[in-house]
């Protein structure tokens, strides 16, 4: 999965898919009542990126729905996975549940179209703070109570704060998520800084172990050819990048073209890939 980073305006969906992304990451901010308000990152953000692009969440979700609904004039077949980077910093552990409930209701209305012919992309809800695990509980409960528990088949989970893996596993369990139940694990740092592959290697080892909790592992934010090669050699499942075309080119190199391919809609993002 090539994951286009910081896609916060509707026009950027086409921009990143045109560059080769089959997945995008979108930042979501919340108001004082725990309601998702904007697709917006703000400062600081990655080097060489404009941090202030935004849409109202409802508008972005409708644009995203069109881009991922077969038959729509805006449909982009390649776009199969969306990561919502949830900026929950202004939520408390007590309001996180409410935030998850309200976000699920918003997705149900504006993205899944009330459960009728909505967007088909798989969704990852990515939370930076393991203390906000109740966001996941609220999200799951809202879909169950609305009679749309079936949509949870399209939803995965990630804690993105680079916490200790055992602590993340514990937070997932508290949220009601079992080991390998649609669990993506991120690892990385802003492109402005350097980071070793230690975190990636630890997560990949967990993913591939008989008693791990991780289904897929992705690395962020990659810019350079050399770093892309290192990530693929570490056998990650996804790469988040500001330059999808760079990763496409790396995948086409002799060293990788017979080992990896781009994921399609027929590839289940929750299944552990046996290497």
Curated annotation (Swiss-Prot):
Its cofactor is Mg(2+). Disulfide bonds join 45-51, 47-192. Binds 1 Mg(2+) ion per subunit. The keyword Disulfide bond applies. The keyword Calcium does not apply. GO terms for molecular function: lyase activity; metal ion binding; phosphoric diester hydrolase activity; toxin activity. It catalyses: an N-(acyl)-sphingosylphosphocholine = an N-(acyl)-sphingosyl-1,3-cyclic phosphate + choline; an N-(acyl)-sphingosylphosphoethanolamine = an N-(acyl)-sphingosyl-1,3-cyclic phosphate + ethanolamine; a 1-acyl-sn-glycero-3-phosphocholine = a 1-acyl-sn-glycero-2,3-cyclic phosphate + choline; a 1-acyl-sn-glycero-3-phosphoethanolamine = a 1-acyl-sn-glycero-2,3-cyclic phosphate + ethanolamine. Its EC number is 4.6.1.-. GO terms for cellular component: extracellular region. Keywords: Cytolysis, Dermonecrotic toxin, Disulfide bond, Hemolysis, Lipid degradation, Lipid metabolism, Lyase, Magnesium, Metal-binding, Secreted, Toxin. InterPro entries: PLC-like_Pdiesterase_TIM-brl (IPR017946). GO terms for biological process: killing of cells of another organism; lipid catabolic process. It is found in: Secreted. The active site is at residues 5, 41. Mg(2+) binds at residues 25, 27, 85. Expressed by the venom gland. Belongs to the arthropod phospholipase D family. Class II subfamily. Dermonecrotic toxins cleave the phosphodiester linkage between the phosphate and headgroup of certain phospholipids (sphingolipid and lysolipid substrates), forming an alcohol (often choline) and a cyclic phosphate. This toxin acts on sphingomyelin (SM). It may also act on ceramide phosphoethanolamine (CPE), lysophosphatidylcholine (LPC) and lysophosphatidylethanolamine (LPE), but not on lysophosphatidylserine (LPS), and lysophosphatidylglycerol (LPG). It acts by transphosphatidylation, releasing exclusively cyclic phosphate products as second products. This is Dermonecrotic toxin LamSicTox-alphaIV1i.
């Amino acid at each position: 999965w090539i994951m286009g980073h910081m896609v916060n305006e509707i026009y950027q969906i086409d921009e990143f898919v045109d560059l080769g992304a089959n997945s995008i990451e979108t930042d979501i901010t919340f108001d004082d009542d725990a309601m998702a308000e904007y697709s917006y990152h703000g400062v600081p953000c990655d080097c060489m990126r404009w941090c202030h692009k935004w849409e109202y969440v409802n508008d972005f979700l409708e644009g995203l729905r069109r881009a991922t609904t077969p038959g729509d004039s805006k449909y982009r077949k390649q776009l199969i996975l969306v990561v919502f980077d949830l900026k929950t910093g202004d939520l408390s552990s007590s309001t996180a549940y409410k935030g998850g409930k309200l976000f699920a209701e918003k997705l149900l209305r504006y993205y899944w179209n009330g459960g009728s012919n909505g967007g088909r992309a798989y969704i990852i809800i990515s939370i930076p703070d393991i203390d906000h695990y109740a966001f996941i509980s609220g999200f799951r409960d809202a879909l169950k109570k609305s009679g749309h528990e079936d949509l949870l088949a399209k939803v995965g989970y990630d804690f993105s704060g680079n916490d200790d893996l055992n602590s993340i596993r514990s937070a997932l369990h508290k949220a009601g998520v079992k080991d390998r139940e649609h669990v993506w694990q991120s690892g990385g740092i802003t492109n402005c800084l350097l980071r070793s592959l230690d975190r990636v290697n630890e997560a990949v080892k967990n993913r591939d172990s008989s008693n791990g909790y991780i289904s897929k592992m992705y690395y962020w934010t990659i810019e350079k050819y050399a770093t892309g090669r290192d990530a693929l050699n570490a056998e990650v499942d996804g790469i988040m990048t500001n330059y999808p075309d760079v990763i496409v080119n790396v995948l086409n190199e002799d060293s990788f073209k017979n080992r990896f391919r781009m994921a399609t809609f027929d590839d289940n993002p929750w299944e552990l890939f046996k290497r």
